Amino acid sequence: LRYSVDLAAVMPAPLKDAAKAMAYIKDHADEWYLDSRYVFVSGFSAGGHLAAALSVFWDNEEMFPEYKDNFDRIRPAGMILGYPVIDLKSTARRLDIGIEGYPDYDKINFGQVHPNVDPADIFVRENNKTYVNFEIAMNAYMFGGYPTDEQIYQYSLQNHVTDTTPPAFIWHGGEDGLIYPRNSFMFAEALREHNIPCELHVFGKGGHGLGLANEVTENNPWEVNEQCARWPKLAADWIKSILRQQ
C-alpha cells in the first residue's frame, strides 16, 4: 500500500490516491466477491476531508480527467465521516496544547510546522502562554505552504456539493475544540440544499479524535465516551437504510 503522506501529501495528490483506491477495488470486485455498486468511503478528521472530497469531486472532469470515460469507477456509494474537516476556515486558531511561556520555536514539541511556513505565524504568544494556530498549520500541509484564497475555496467542500454527491453519515463530538462541529453542520446543510440523503449526529459530549470512542481506540481516558461510541451501530443502520432505497 503506497500513498501520499507528510510533505508529499499536497492536494490533489491524496485525492488522486483515494480515486485510484476506489477504482482498484471496483476493478477487482468480481475477483474479491464484492458488489461494486456498494463501495462506501469513510474517513475521520483530515481523512474525513479526503473522503468527502472524493464524494463531491468524483464526477468533476477538471479534477479527474483520467476517469472521464467512466466516472462510476471512482464514485462512492456513500460516505461515513467522523469529525471531518470540511471548511478550511473552521479550525482552531488559538489551540492550547499546554505550552507555558514563550519558548524558542525549535524547542516546542509540535510536529506540524511546515518548512515553508514561518513558525511565528503558527505559534501565538500571549498571556505568558504559547498557542497554536492550527488552521495555518493544517492548511500548510494540504497545500505545501501558505494557501491562496482560491485554494481555500476550492477545498472547502461545502462549496462543491452537487445533485450527484452521494449520501452521507456524519458524526461529531459537540466539544471538539480542534475541528469545530460547524464543519459537519455546514456540510449537512449543503447536502440538504441539494436533496442528498444525510444523517448527522452531533453528540453533546466528546472532543476530537475519538475513533471508536471506546477502550479499543483510546489513548486517553477522555476518549472513552458512551454517547459517541454509538456511532458504528448508527452508521451500520444508516448503510442498511441507504441500500434499501437503491
Language-model features, listed with the residues they occupy:
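Short beta-strand/loop motif that positions the catalytic acidic residue
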Residues: 164, 169-172, 176
